[in-house]
């Protein structure tokens, strides 16, 4: 097996927590476990002390409109390392830096399209209208993805978006989740009051996640109590919405929890509700199902392949609160149906592992390096185990 030196460039990383962070962290760990040398290039955080030698922190500034996020502000001295290949995960300053370095050093550049960027334009005043008038966001993304040697996306639902950017032959590789951490979670006190039906939803409390629709649905299930695991800018709005619905006493905003404990909350839930229609994949759906929790979710883009519809859960049309309520009520009132879907959910949720995903990514690397498939993957017995990175969970999708 040939060992590579790989640079993973990402504009969001620990201590941030979201789907991209989870994806990059798991990929880095598994590539190292298969014998490759990996360096994650990410923004620094003023109060975060980096303890891992495989993470290169780049100077950053605070986002004007998103004060909890950092925007990398790289200089030439930040990039004295050399790689056999660069893999970018975001189209901002570090992603574009990775693209330029690959071109300068004449090495392959692989890019993963994790996020439907236009859906997040509302975070920057004027960006949505600028995109509508000029296509600025799409053109910037096309600069990165259209010039990559290979493009990966987690779901087939993103293929049309990439083709609109004139990306040729994108490869679908699902983002993995690490079952070891979820399944080994220590017991935690139940956040659900005794005697209530236990409904869970997980994610960053942000407008595009549409947790207001989840509240609307649970308001129509009088014996249910909703737990929201995650934090974000919409918390005050969602709490006020719960008050308006007269259900403030039936909702618990759990906030941030250590990643090692998250599996314990999934394990206690009876049902997972999710209403976001902007997901590239919806990792939380996979996590819930891995822990045996049936899912009722909006079917749109990435979530269309995130649930085995009718077996591990149900997908409903965008914005259809009545359908969310109908399927939730059916699952909670029929023990035999719930048991069957719980068993199917465990099987479906375990369908992607970090090892399998890394092997698929390594085959993409081999292709752009003009090597035969399998050249870069270690035999199973040759893998070395690495402990998952410790991290705190603030909500990802």
What are these regions (language model features)?
Residues 308-310, 314-321, 330-335, 350:
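Conserved acidic donor-binding segment of nucleotide-sugar-dependent glycosyltransferases
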Residues 277:
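Aromatic "clamp/platform" in nucleotide-sugar-dependent glycosyltransferases that forms part
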Residues 22, 197-220, 233-239, 322:
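A conserved mid-protein helix/loop that constitutes part of the nucleotide-sugar donor-binding site
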Residues 120, 300-310, 314-315:
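Short acidic/histidine- and often glycine-rich active-site loop of Leloir-type glycosyltransferases
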Residues 42, 56, 131-185, 194:
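Donor nucleotide-sugar binding/catalytic pocket of nucleotide-sugar-dependent glycosyltransferases
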Residues 145, 256-257, 264-269, 361:
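Short alpha-helical donor nucleotide-sugar binding micro-motif in glycosyltransferases
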Residues 239-257:
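Nucleotide-activated donor-binding/catalytic signature segment of Leloir-type glycosyltransferases, i.e.
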Residues 285, 294-298:
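Short hydrophobic beta-strand element within catalytic cores of glycosyltransferases
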């Amino acid at each position: 097996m040939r060992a590579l030196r790989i640079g993973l460039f990402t504009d969001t990383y620990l201590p941030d927590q979201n789907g991209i962070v989870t994806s990059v962290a798991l990929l880095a760990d598994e590539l190292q476990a298969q014998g490759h040398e990996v360096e994650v290039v990410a923004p620094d955080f003023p109060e975060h002390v980096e303890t891992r030698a495989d993470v290169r922190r780049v100077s950053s500034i605070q986002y004007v409109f998103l004060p909890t996020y950092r925007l990398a502000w790289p200089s030439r001295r930040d990039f004295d390392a050399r790689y056999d290949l660069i893999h970018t995960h975001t189209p901002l300053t570090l992603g574009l830096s990775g693209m330029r370095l690959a071109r300068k050093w004449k090495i392959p550049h692989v890019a993963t399209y994790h996020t439907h960027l236009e859906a997040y334009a509302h975070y920057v005043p004027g960006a949505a209208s600028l995109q509508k008038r000029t296509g600025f966001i799409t053109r910037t993304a096309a600069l990165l993805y259209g010039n990559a040697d290979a493009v990966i996306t987690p779901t087939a639902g993103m293929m049309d978006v990439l083709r609109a950017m004139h990306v040729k032959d994108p490869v679908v590789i699902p983002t993995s989740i690490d079952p070891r951490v979820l399944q080994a979670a220590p017991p935690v006190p139940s956040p659900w009051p005794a005697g209530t039906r236990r409904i869970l939803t997980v994610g960053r409390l942000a407008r595009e996640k549409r947790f207001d629709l989840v509240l609307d649905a649970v308001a129509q299930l009088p014996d249910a109590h909703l737990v929201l695991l995650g934090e974000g800018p919409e918390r005050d709005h969602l709490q006020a919405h719960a008050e308006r619905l007269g259900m403030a006493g039936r909702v618990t905003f759990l906030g941030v929890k250590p990643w090692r404990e998250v599996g314990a909350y999934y394990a206690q839930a009876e049902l997972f509700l999710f209403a976001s229609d902007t997901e590239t994949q919806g990792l939380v759906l996979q996590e819930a199902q891995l822990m045996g929790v049936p899912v009722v979710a909006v079917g749109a883009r990435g979530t269309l392949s995130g649930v085995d519809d009718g077996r591990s859960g149900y997908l409903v049309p965008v914005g259809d609160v009545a359908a969310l309520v109908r399927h939730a009520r059916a699952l909670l009132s029929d023990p035999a149906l719930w048991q069957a879907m719980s068993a199917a959910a465990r099987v479906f949720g375990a369908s992607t592992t970090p090892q399998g995903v890394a092997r698929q990514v390594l085959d993409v690397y081999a292709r752009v390096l003009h090597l035969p498939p399998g050249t870069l993957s270690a035999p199973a017995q040759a893998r070395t185990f690495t402990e998952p990175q410790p991290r705190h969970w603030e909500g990802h999708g």
